[in-house]
């Protein structure tokens, strides 16, 4: 098991929003989707997993060990093992695509693997743009660069926060294919937030549904039977995921 949340909660004192009793786990090599309407706390869950924001109750376990007990060095190592692809990528103005990919190795004090960089550029259709400054790229192309940086990190877990929102249909499928191939080749686990149910249904081993600030159900696409829930949103999502 790569990550586990047990009754995790988050309170925001200056607002009425809170997360309650978030419990789930992700196995090694598993692709898990997280779906929910806007404002239900999907991104907050990812940030708590990666340690970007603290959680107020419950426990998070990484590879079976409680994160709260980690030393600073252990936390740094965990964050190296968890790649986070944000919805709003932060690329350096004035620097090239290739510079950003080489930076992954430099930040980890590793020799730059030019072959690996060229392979990922070719896979994503960015080879002709490798010397182009990132601020000149389209939003979809910039998202591809951010995704490539995560892949080169060779993480144990990738957190994807609506990474396909700025991509056209073909580019979106390329990114999801890349993540799926990465899972198959390296056994990497992936937790992804997305609104395109057809892609979640196609690529995820299971999909968790977040409603009223808690996980209300977990669906194995197509294979499970539909349970009736009170939320119309949840019903509609499950109907789509469970039926061909």
Where are these regions (language model features)?
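The feature captures the beta-strand-to-loop junction immediately N-terminal to the Walker
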Residues: 35-37
């Amino acid at each position: 098991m790569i990550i586990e949340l047990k009754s995790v909660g988050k309170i925001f004192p200056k607002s009425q929003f809170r997360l309650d009793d978030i419990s789930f786990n992700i196995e090694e090599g598993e692709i898990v989707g997280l779906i929910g309407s806007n404002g239900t706390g999907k991104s907050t869950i990812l940030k708590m997993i990666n340690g970007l924001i603290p959680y107020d109750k419950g426990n998070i376990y990484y590879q079976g060990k409680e994160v709260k007990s980690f030393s600073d060095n252990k936390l740094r190592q965990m964050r190296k093992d968890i790649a986070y692809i944000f919805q709003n990528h932060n690329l350096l103005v004035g620097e090239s695509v290739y510079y950003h990919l080489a930076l992954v190795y430099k930040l980890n004090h590793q020799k730059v693997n030019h072959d690996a960089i060229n392979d990922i550029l070719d896979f994503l259709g960015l080879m002709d743009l490798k010397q182009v400054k990132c601020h000149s790229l389209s939003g979809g192309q910039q998202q591809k660069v951010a995704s490539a940086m995560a892949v080169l990190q060779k993480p144990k877990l990738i957190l994807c926060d609506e990474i396909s929102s700025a991509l056209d249909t073909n580019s979106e499928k390329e990114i999801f294919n890349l993540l799926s191939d990465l899972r198959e080749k390296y056994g990497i686990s992936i937790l992804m937030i997305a609104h395109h149910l057809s892609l979640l249904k196609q690529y995820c081993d299971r999909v968790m549904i977040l409603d009223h600030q808690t996980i209300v159900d977990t669906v194995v696409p197509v294979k499970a039977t539909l349970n009736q829930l009170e939320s119309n949103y949840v019903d509609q999502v499950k109907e789509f995921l469970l039926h061909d």
